[in-house]
Curated annotation (Swiss-Prot):
K(+) 1 binds at T129, I130, T256, I257. K(+) channel subunit that may homo- and heterodimerize to form functional channels with distinct regulatory and gating properties. Can heterodimerize with KCNK13 subunit to conduct K(+) outward rectifying currents at the plasma membrane. The homodimers are mainly retained in the endoplasmic reticulum compartment and may be targeted to the cell surface upon phosphorylation or other activation signals yet to be elucidated. Residues 256-261 are annotated as: Selectivity filter 2. It comes from Rattus norvegicus. Residues 11-16 are annotated as: ER retention/retrieval signal. K(+) 4 binds at T129, T256. The keyword Transmembrane helix applies. Each subunit contributes two pore-forming domains 1 and 2 which assemble to form a single pore with M2 and M4 transmembrane helices lining the central cavity and M1 and M3 facing the lipid bilayer. The transmembrane helices are bridged by the selectivity filters 1 and 2 that coordinate the permeant ions. Up to four ions can simultaneously occupy the selectivity filter and at least two elementary charges must translocate across the filter to convert it into the open conformation. This is Potassium channel subfamily K member 12.
Amino acid sequence: MSSRSPRPPPRRCRRRLPRPSCCCCCCRRSHLNEDTGRFVLLAALIGLYLVAGATVFSALESPGEAEARARWGATLRNFSAAHGVAEPELRAFLRHYEAALAAGVRADALRPRWDFPGAFYFVGTVVSTIGFGMTTPATVGGKAFLIAYGLFGCAGTILFFNLFLERIISLLAFIMRACRERQLRRSGLLPATFRRGSALSEADSLAGWKPSVYHVLLILGLFAVLLACCASAMYTSVEGWDYVDSLYFCFVTFSTIGFGDLVSSQHAAYRNQGLYRLGNFLFILLGVCCIYSLFNVISILIKQVLNWMLRKLSCRCCTRCCPAPGAPLSRRNAITPGSRLRRRLAALGTDPAARDSDAEGRRLSGELISMRDLTASNKVSLALLQKQLSETANGYPRSVCVNTRQNGFSGGVGALGIMNNRLAETSASR
């Protein structure tokens, strides 16, 4: 007898079906560019927000507009009949009045529009992007100069707002960190000899502590409300407006919407005029800076909602395409049953269990290597640079962690870049 092992049966060439992967192509494409998905989702939500706002304002303001048109038509007809003036001639006269109104002419005595104080008020509304519209350049030279002046003025003012945002966030973080240290010291978690910047502070529970965006939002919101209430009290007593109209003017001005239906400091003379104009300037300056900072903090919350919605959509897509977590993954061939494959391996003298364990080890090793490479090259250079600069300026530890997770805030520009790693919700470790 021959000592040779029995020759295995000839292997049939069978066409293998594609093996279903855990993450299908649609899931992979959904993760390619999360920023694009966030942008598209935000654009869709803004569109829905505009539709909802237009519906509400149309329902609230449309009846009043119809009544005002009816009253104005009746008044015009009565005046034309009472004074014997033809209605077309009366309308032509009203068009001349509208042109004079656009040029700054008013029926009541108002302050000059283009003296130095009036021009200073105008350029202030230009560079702050408020743009009330009560004063506009009428000459060609004035319009041409406004284009160049507004280009650099608006850019410089936006930079000023961003620097103000950086300072106010740093100040709030410093105050809240001091309150946190005091609370920990009272509870006995910090020794009485604790000093910021020491080695103990870096190893203790305050290492890398950052204020929550909700606390910053609450503080900025309370300060904005207090500022608007104080300014409204001044406008009510000096301008003679209702308190609700004064609050409305404060929001329209501080948010740089600037409708122009209500404009402060437009009368020819005021009691304590110099003091009032100074107070008006300071209130508008502080209000615009505060509301700008508040808007940027609110944008962080909106971005968190967008990230949550994207995660939900991604998880829903993955649950349709991928097996449930914890389910055993079958490594059988789609054509050859497992029993036949085991018999063939036994005929070849190969242990199926050892073969599976070896393949499993190689697969896990490959996954670990790929995950390690992915973590090392996960766009951490810019985020780490911003984190180091921010933590150096705020006294945070300089420990560098390369295992940063993309939360949608790292590597931002503008106001989001300024608040990067300064709040708990914009930290790269979240």
